[in-house]
Amino acid sequence: MSITCELLNLTSKKAKKSSSSDKKWLKKPLFFLILCGSLVIVLVMFLRLGRSQKEETDSCNGEEKVLYRHQNVTRSEIHDLVSLFSDSDQVTSFECHKESSPGMWTNYGITCSLSVRSDKQETRGLPWNLGLGHSISSTSCMCGNLEPILQQPENLEEENHEEGLEQGLSSYLRNAWWCLILGVLVCHKIYVSHSKARGERKEKVHLQEALAPKKQQQRAQTSSRGAGRWRKNILLLGILGGVSFSVWWFWDTNEEIIMKRRETLANMCDERARVLQDQFNVSLNHVHALSILVSTFHHGKIPSAIDQRTFEEYTERTNFERPLTSGVAYALKVPHSEREKFEKEHGWAIKKMETEDQTVVQDCVPENFDPAPIQDEYAPVIFAQETVSHIVSVDMMSGEEDRENILRARASGKGVLTSPFKLLKSNHLGVVLTFAVYDTSLPPDATEEQRVEATIGYLGASYDMPSLVEKLLHQLASKQTIAVDVYDTTNTSGLIKMYGSEIGDISEQHISSLDFGDPSRNHEMHCRFKHKLPIPWTAITPSILVLVITFLVGYILYEAINRIATVEEDCQKMRELKARAEAADIAKSQFLATVSHEIRTPMNGVLGMLKMLMDTDLDAKQMDYAQTAHGSGKDLTSLINEVLDQAKIESGRLELENVPFDMRFILDNVSSLLSGKANEKGIELAVYVSSQVPDVVVGDPSRFRQIITNLVGNSIKFTQERGHIFISVHLADEVKEPLTIEDAVLKQRLALGCSESGETVSGFPAVNAWGSWKNFKTCYSTESQNSDQIKLLVTVEDTGVGIPVDAQGRIFTPFMQADSSTSRTYGGTGIGLSISKRLVELMQGEMGFVSEPGIGSTFSFTGVFGKAETNTSITKLERFDLAIQEFTGLRALVIDNRNIRAEVTRYELRRLGISADIVSSLRMACTCCISKLENLAMILIDKDAWNKEEFSVLDELFTRSKVTFTRVPKIFLLATSATLTERSEMKSTGLIDEVVIKPLRMSVLICCLQETLVNGKKRQPNRQRRNLGHLLREKQILVVDDNLVNRRVAEGALKKYGAIVTCVESGKAALAMLKPPHNFDACFMDLQMPEMDGFEATRRVRELEREINKKIASGEVSAEMFCKFSSWHVPILAMTADVIQATHEECMKCGMDGYVSKPFEEEVLYTAVARFFEPC
């Protein structure tokens, strides 16, 4: 309500000032919106123009890039090729080009090739291979075509560049002006609507001023609602504009991608069509040249210089000039009147081309053909290449299509093509190219009648079109990108596919025309991409980014508008709705808070009083009773904590800490905590951490300790007399590659499927841990891991009774045990493993196990931890640094017949900076050379490897070599359990300097080594402990609790450290005691108290301190009046049984400095207060 009153007062006092400044304030966003819109439009326009210019430049250089990429030829090399020809050759080629018509490319190419002398061709040859297998003459045939092509790109670049600039500039200017006009209209509309809203608001203000004061709250709500409405309208328009811009960007970019794809397809298709057409025409020129050769040397000379053998040999040796042809043949023109004479000269009859069943001649034996029927003219084949030698004597005029082809060829004087037909053997479609061979006396400008009369024969060449196209296109770099089809389109009603397949995206294709030199036949090349258009991520990504930014900015502005426009009534409604939605959760939280407080508060009194009772003068029996009661109370507290943890996990309220901690220190604590129970049963407890595990990791140390404690506690509980419990920690990456494992312990554990006696810590068989690792996804996952995180694999192995097979499926179910007798025999509630598994899952890990009844169980889990910074240090371990410095560089010898146990001992020594060698027996130690035994600081012998007779030999060796040794090593015996009497007896023999009781841990080793090696030097930790005991001496501490027992427990614990304790029973009394000035140095505050709880009392105390500090700072009062303190802040720590995280957060929010949960120990109380005082 106070917030509402302040808002109403501010509105009534500044209504006129606000209304007068609204107009000026409004003009600023409108102007800013117009300016931003204009800048965005201009920026987008220039970006697009720049990209268009780059695209124009890239497209202009496209042909040059394609030529270089596919033929490895640059523009300068083409110019060099042209410059190789002499001026006369170039002039001749240009004249040929000028005289020829557009359809006569082949003819003038041949003429140019013939005009170049053979000797010049040899001297001007260029090793420039286009991948087509042509000779130098074929290169010269194309010389007349290169220069016109090279003269065009520069002009085309300039024209295309100017045209692209003009079109792009006009298009984007037009779009920009339209957007700007639209933005101005929208801004004007907003301004008009706001003017109306402002007028209405002024009228409402005048009416509200006349109303009674009781309606001020309603007026403030209405004004605020109206003031926020127009802001939401502008925000909505802005979001719509951003969405529209995102959609437009996607559409424009996608269209551009499609256009580029089409242009790429067109360029690639045109390039292939041009290559195919050019090479076909080059081959056509060679066939034409062959026809001229036949005319010159067969008909022009008497006798003829060519026969079948010569023709066959010549065509075979010059076949490299016609790599695209399947074969060539020459047919002689024979009139009917000369048929008999012709047949007598050649010794064979002219055969008919087609048989009665219309089978193609290539598929039949010529001897089986019928004689050619009587007709005016015949065209029998007299010369043929070896590949088509079977058609000799066949009349080419007897075939309908070949007859038409021959007639067109001799009438036009050009090469003509047949329609596609299937070739022999290959079953491919092919065509036949026919040239008429004329008499050498035929003039160049002969008429059609003259050409028919001068015809003396016909030269034909067959082409296998699929092989031809495949041969020409296989050298192109992007051959696999597009699919190419070649069609004969002479008959538009029925296209004939000469080459191609059905693969590819037929929805988008490009058609390029082909000119094979026959104007009466039409051919086309159809190209398409083999794959469909991929997802346009280039268009989607920026569009989504713009959309996300739009919504993010819109959300931020919307939240800001809501914060401005929200009134207390709306907040209250939201709180009510939220309270209804979370009613069940609040009830559960209240239940947990009440139960934990009601149970833990009396437990605090029970444990506190028992502890105080044990500090009194009790006899042995009374002390035993008090210790038993205290232990049972702690067990009950642990049970309560487990139940509360399970409830918090189920409700999803459990959160993990993220602080640096030393995992080895945690494992030492757990082994120290549980070593007593393990030693009572004679169980060997061992801990090993891989050297690859960092010294400090980031995570939740308390929850990690809880998991280890649960697993090890269960192992101790279910392990009978003797045996072992082995805790090992490795990086999960170490087990990914079993063949590359370097860690000695891990390698031995993976060596056998089920560990043998000699391969375990105690010698008792244990199940192999591999069974619990192999199903972990996190261990063998191939996903990349963050560089600042590590995955740890923790294994707890025991030699207990094992888990029955039928009970293994429900082992992680809460409140479930193997059978009903388990709880009666071993105790427990069955929720420890369930809690541990859920905690592991919160650590992004997995938990599993493998167990065999009668052998034991192995539990393993993984967890993700953070890597600590290199300079991170743990305060708890700093007290060991000095001791480690004393031991660094020492050498030790470990004698143990168990390899894994010896590695555990070496691991503990390595933590102290001591290097150790391992031997398996005392006999092997005796056989070691003197150099290995020299400079040893200590020898550690496991009790299982101890043999008095063998050790006497080793002791004698030390005695004889005492001169060579700088010092005699100390002897330590490592035992799982030993009474004080047994330890004294062992040391009295003089062979052993000290007996170390396992489990080995840093603190125990430091203590033993310091007492033995440094001759009883006092340990640094004890000195530090005694110094810390003076921190609370003479300190004034206030304890606030409504429970008398709790006050007495806290008072007794603090008085032991010399503190002066004052107790009060309520928050009001504490408020009076803590009102400055006062003499208290710290305060323990209970949270749940009648009249005034701890939260309210702390808030009141902080308010009083702030007021006093403010007055002292401003000089209103002097510091001498308040005990010369310039700033008052008494440390207040909460005492409560409520352990829910929400309560802890509330304590910090109200101004408390710390948190102590009940029941608490003396150490807990002392540590909580001591951190606020400087050591003396």
UniProtKB/Swiss-Prot annotation:
The enzyme's E.C. designation: 2.7.13.3
Alphabetic keyword roster: Cytokinin signaling pathway, Developmental protein, Endoplasmic reticulum, Kinase, Membrane, Phosphoprotein, Transferase, Transmembrane, Transmembrane helix
Pfam families: CHASE (PF03924), HATPase_c (PF02518), HisKA (PF00512), Receiver_CRE1 (PF24896), Response_reg (PF00072)
Residue(s) carrying 4-aspartylphosphate: D942, D1086
GO molecular function, one term: protein histidine kinase activity
Disruption phenotype: Hypersensitivity to ABA, and strong drought and salinity tolerance. Slightly reduced sensitivity to cytokinin. More rapid germination, reduced requirement for light, and decreased far-red light sensitivity. Reduced sensitivity to N-isobutyl decanamide. Defects in procambium proliferation and absence of secondary growth. Enhanced freezing tolerance. Impaired meristematic development in seedlings. Disturbed cytokinin-mediated flower development abnormality.
This protein's GO CC annotations: endoplasmic reticulum membrane; plasma membrane
Function: Cytokinins (CK) receptor related to bacterial two-component regulators. Functions as a histidine kinase and transmits the stress signal to a downstream MAPK cascade. This protein undergoes an ATP-dependent autophosphorylation at a conserved histidine residue in the kinase core, and a phosphoryl group is then transferred to a conserved aspartate residue in the receiver domain. In the presence of cytokinin, feeds phosphate to phosphorelay-integrating histidine phosphotransfer protein (HPt) and activates subsequent cascade. Involved in meristems establishment in seedlings.
Protein name: Histidine kinase 2
Organism of derivation: Arabidopsis thaliana (Mouse-ear cress)
